[in-house]
Design a protein with these regions (language model features):
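Active-site rim loops that border cofactor/substrate pockets in soluble metabolic enzymes
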Residues: 50-77
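Short, ordered loop/turn segments at secondary-structure junctions
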Residues: 31, 62, 87-88, 123-127
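Mobile beta-alpha loop/short-helix "lid" or hinge segments that flank ligand
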Residues: 10-16, 114-130
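Glycine-rich phosphate-binding loop
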Residues: 67, 71-107
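A charged, well-structured terminal subsegment
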Residues: 140-159
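Glycine-rich phosphate/diphosphate-binding loop of Rossmann-like nucleotide-binding domains
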Residues: 12-59
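Phosphate-binding/catalytic loops
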Residues: 126-140
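Short, acidic/small-residue loops that bind anionic groups at enzyme active sites
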Residues: 97-124
Length: 159
């Protein structure tokens, strides 16, 4: 996703019909708040730059990344799209793999069931340093990328 955005800035022009009336949900994992807050700030910045009103950005906080799909599902009747933001850092057990698989499957299932764009802004890294590099560091901010993705999908959906 990010390499596409960096290489193709002309593709970032997103033409939304009546963007000031579109409500977008952002579900944020409370685990690793030093990462997820920066992801949220990046996503919110992109939405505001694309004329989504601040009062139409609905934030829902959940305990961890595993709860992101349920948080997204709760928002689907109130919004036109959802951005899921979280951070899972690999440890010494298989827990990482189970969480990453469950979250990615859950998010796509919510999207397909609700027929709404739901973006996957969950960092899955080996270290905290890698997560920091992807939440405003040298590898950009994946919260921004997730917001661009959901806006682009909204534009495609409304053609």
């Amino acid at each position: 996703m990010s390499s596409f955005i960096k290489k193709s800035p002309s593709n970032l022009k997103i033409d939304l019909v009546f963007p000031d009336s579109i409500k977008i949900g952002i579900v944020v994992s409370a685990w690793h708040p030093e990462i997820t807050e920066t992801l949220f700030q990046g996503a919110e910045k992109v939405l505001l730059e694309n004329k989504i009103k601040k009062e139409n950005i609905i934030r829902k906080d959940v305990p961890g990344s595993f709860e992101l799909p349920f948080g997204a599902q709760l928002l689907t009747e109130k919004v036109k799209a959802v951005i899921c933001l979280g951070c899972v850092i690999k440890g010494e057990t298989d827990h990482y793999d189970f969480i990453c698989n469950a979250v990615s499957n859950g998010i796509i299932n919510v999207s397909l069931k609700a027929n709404l764009p739901v973006s996957f802004g969950v960092l899955t890294t080996n270290t905290l340093d890698q997560a920091q590099e992807r939440s405003g560091g040298k590898h950009g901010n994946k919260g921004e990328d997730s917001a661009y993705a959901v806006l682009k999908m909204l534009a495609i959906q409304n053609r």
